[in-house]
């Protein structure tokens, strides 16, 4: 049938007249129950959905309504009951539904005796049949025939029951002429209620005939025990024969008249055929608890963590095992929480997942006063996010949107989110619509700003995960990583050794040009960071026995006549030598050191000199240089470079 115009104001008037304390929502499905119209006095139904917004969430200038191709179920759908003319003012071009859908709950032909909607069924009249197509008419006649057949069967069954009751009444009235004694029939001539004198009753032997001359059928053993409760029973032996009865007979008293017939035994009731068979009780659906636990994990041991745990995994649980009824959701929740003491829920608490979380939260945390709601929601937002905090706040505050929004607004991640949320929420028609669409708006804004569900930056999370993956190694690669680290450390040690040797050569080269650097004064200092600290400070690399030999090989043409400036900082090797001498020896110029190095070079040509020997020689040379003048020739055995 397509879309049609909707008059929202008339729809609101219908809601108010029917006592519905709310406003219609976007995409709400409503059942219309039309009480009479152009088709006649019968009741007809149609299921419609209303549209108040477009796809972007903006209000429509002209709201629309659209018929749904489903039957109306008043027990499930929100149903509006009014005459067809009044409903047509709100829903333009309103008409009955197509086919058998116009019968509403009876669209499938299931007529239930005693049901309100079944008892008001009216078959289509001539004016309604005239508007039907051939296929539609055949379908309606089929369903109408089924309903009429069920009604006829019910009438026949009730007629049989009425005839049975009449027969029982006639049988009971026919027994009023007979006394209810087992195995005996009263003479038809004796009227009911006629007094019988006790003196006429004589003891009857077993072989004699009955008082009614019934050929000896009756015997005292056949007395019905129920007759003993009668105040005066002439068929029991009297006190005259000495046997006595249940109640002594008083001869002087007049015979009592039977006021009524004694109660008859209940007749065997005829089986009543129930036409409408009760629907079979559906077998309880098996819950795949193992599959659900594979997604959610184990239940938290702390009961206070259970509500938020269920709230986080509600979507995953619905994905594994969809739940359509509160009863089924209640069974799943109780199975997950494992019957914890005091946490078992009823179906009334499991209308949706928000109600489940709210009920469990109140049970585990207690009922909070309203002035502490801000602290509760702040803790929930910090742990679970704004969306979860909003849902819980709505439940705990009894749908107070303004209170919850005022608490959560300062907790949003940034002014951009606050502005965007306020702009979108202001476009909603009322607080109920804002509550319904809050999470949708929040997720859209988070996605637009590049934030995750908790308002955190996605780029930061990705960088953190990338660094974490690069820092961590997979299982099975630990041995390979250890080997790589060992090889890398060995290469670094080799590289440092080579750099140390190269640094020694560079130091020797700078010593050869020390005179020129001394002339520059302070400008000649080497300001690069010192790799090794002097040994007098506890540092240093130590010396090898062949370090001097390597220095001489690297600098064979160094002259000993070039003076060194006292302001020049000694090199690491020279500092190593000076640390073993006295303070006066360290104050001399570099001429003595040059002669000492030359003497060691000549000595190394003939034999290997120990480090201790070289140190002793250098110490004695430095002492002799301190006692003498600067022009004193070196000790014997030393050679000048010019020689």
Curated annotation (Swiss-Prot):
Q: Where is this motif: Nuclear localization signal?
A: 523-544
The protein's site described by Cleavage is found at: 293-294, 321-322, 334-335, 610-611
Output the Gene Ontology terms for molecular function.
DNA binding; RNA binding
Keyword annotations for this protein, in alphabetical order, are: Capsid protein, Cytoplasmic inwards viral transport, DNA-binding, Host cytoplasm, Host nucleus, Host-virus interaction, Microtubular inwards viral transport, RNA-binding, Viral budding, Viral budding via the host ESCRT complexes, Viral nucleoprotein, Viral release from host cell, Virion, Virus entry into host cell
Q: Where is the composition biased (Low complexity)?
A: 198-211, 461-474, 481-514, 547-572, 603-632
Gene Ontology annotations for the cellular component aspect, listed alphabetically: host cell; host cell cytoplasm; host cell nucleus; host cytoskeleton; viral nucleocapsid
Q: Which processes are annotated in GO (biological process)?
A: microtubule-dependent intracellular transport of viral material towards nucleus; symbiont entry into host cell; viral budding via host ESCRT complex; viral release from host cell
Motif PTAP/PSAP motif extends across 251-254
List other remarks.
Answer: Foamy viruses are distinct from other retroviruses in many respects. Their protease is active as an uncleaved Pro-Pol protein. Mature particles do not include the usual processed retroviral structural protein (MA, CA and NC), but instead contain two large Gag proteins. Their functional nucleic acid appears to be either RNA or dsDNA (up to 20% of extracellular particles), because they probably proceed either to an early (before integration) or late reverse transcription (after assembly). Foamy viruses have the ability to retrotranspose intracellularly with high efficiency.
Domain note for this entry? Gag protein contains 3 glycine-arginine motifs (GR-boxes) necessary for RNA packaging, the first of which has nucleic acid binding properties in vitro. Late-budding domains (L domains) are short sequence motifs essential for viral particle budding. They recruit proteins of the host ESCRT machinery (Endosomal Sorting Complex Required for Transport) or ESCRT-associated proteins. Gag protein contains a PTAP/PSAP motif, which interacts with the UEV domain of TSG101.
Q: What is this protein called?
A: Gag polyprotein
- Source lineage: Viruses, Riboviria, Pararnavirae, Artverviricota, Revtraviricetes
